[in-house]
Amino acid sequence: MQYNILKKSFYAQQSLDVAEKLLGKKLLFNKHQGIITETEAYIGHDDPAAHSSHGYTKRTSVMFGDPGFSYVYFIYGMYHCLNVVTEPRGFPAAVLIRGIVLLLEDQPNIIINGPGKLCKILHITKEHNNIDMTQNYNFCICNTGINIHNYICTPRIGISRGKEKFWRFVVSDLTFLQHLKLENKVYSI
């Protein structure tokens, strides 16, 4: 199958632009497909909530790498979180995928809110860290043709520092997404 996978140039943009533009895109992971409904940006050395605020470490090295790579980490001893690296190589930034509408074939679509819940349901773990999502048909984000105009920006949640930044993007009306169907057809590039 060929998919209209987002390219490195998409992720190399400013993180806030990427976080906004990811709304309505399709996350593909193995056989799962979900429309992205919630994101959060984490930007650079000066963002106190970003892992990169502590500098370059083994854990954060992927954030300093090429845009479009997955950054998956483990928090609170129980949850994995999926991010995609943004901005040009060398500038540490990523966008957290906080929520999707999971598209199902023979049953109603499921709204998944929360990055830990998302990774648990899709079975995304640390073994999926540092994967080039611009070259992997089993783990990527694709264009859908869906333009999201109804969204809100809020402060980021679930963090203790940097809460004042309105860097969380949330689709405000999920009604139309609940009726989308799973597509098993080939996408044009």
Swiss-Prot record:
Belongs to the DNA glycosylase MPG family. This is Putative 3-methyladenine DNA glycosylase. GO terms for biological process: base-excision repair. CDD domains: AAG. The lineage of its organism: Bacteria, Pseudomonadati, Pseudomonadota, Alphaproteobacteria, Rickettsiales. It is an enzyme of class 3 (hydrolase). It holds the Pfam family Pur_DNA_glyco. It comes from Ehrlichia canis (strain Jake). One of its GO terms (molecular function) is DNA binding. Keywords: DNA damage, DNA repair, Hydrolase. SUPFAM superfamilies: FMT C-terminal domain-like. Its EC number is 3.2.2.-.
